[in-house]
């Protein structure tokens, strides 16, 4: 599996599925969540409302998949990252679960490429370096366990220079 890092707009990625850093209500909001909902069009909100009507809410660490509306991608996986409190409330485990469950959902649909944003590092306040370490470790661990998966490319789409630098540094190290 190839793991790449780019700086850019996740809504413009030409991959099978993009991951949305969603809130528990899946109703859009600020940051990447709002950008994805706006770019995908009104049908996405309708589909998300149907999902929430069925499941109630999507708690931190969980993920659901929907169609992608007007995006280049075919699907959107809505992963609800944890709000950072102090690191003593399972935040890292919940963040890892977002990545793991997103990969499971993508593989379950035999998709080959997936793009992740920097989940929980915006208004949710997760420390960027720790979030990058969790993301890369989890993706690599998943790839080891699911070596015969359909997924051939994982792309991290960074929204700022700080995340881009962190990911590039970590991706080239053996620490993660």
Curated annotation (Swiss-Prot):
The Macro domain covers which part of the protein? Answer: 1-175
Tell me the InterPro entries matching this sequence: Macro_dom, Macro_dom-like
The protein's matches in Pfam families, at most eight in alphabetical order, are given as: Macro
Q: Which domain of life is it from?
A: Bacteria
**What are the disulfide bonds?**
none
NCBIfam families attached to this UniProt entry: PRK00431.1-4 (NF001663), PRK00431.1-6 (NF001664)
Q: Which family does it belong to?
A: Belongs to the MacroD-type family.
Provide the protein name: Macro domain-containing protein lin2902
Organism, scientific name:
Listeria innocua serovar 6a (strain ATCC BAA-680 / CLIP 11262)
């Amino acid at each position: 599996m190839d793991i790449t890092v780019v700086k850019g707009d996740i809504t413009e990625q030409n991959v099978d599925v993009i991951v949305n850093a969603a809130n528990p209500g899946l109703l859009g909001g600020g940051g990447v969540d709002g950008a994805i909902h706006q770019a995908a069009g009104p049908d996405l909100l309708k589909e998300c409302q149907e999902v929430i009507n069925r499941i109630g809410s999507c708690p931190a660490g969980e993920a659901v998949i929907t169609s992608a509306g007007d995006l280049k991608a075919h699907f959107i996986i809505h992963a609800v990252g944890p709000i950072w409190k102090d690191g003593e409330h399972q935040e890292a485990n919940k963040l890892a679960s977002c990545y793991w469950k997103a990969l499971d959902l993508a593989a379950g649909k035999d998709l080959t490429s997936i793009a992740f944003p920097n989940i929980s590092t915006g208004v949710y306040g997760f420390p960027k370096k720790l979030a990058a370490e969790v993301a890369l470790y989890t993706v690599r661990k998943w790839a080891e366990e699911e070596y015969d998966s359909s997924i051939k490319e994982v792309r991290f789409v960074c929204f700022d220079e700080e995340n881009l630098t962190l990911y590039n540094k970590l991706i080239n190290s053996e620490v993660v």
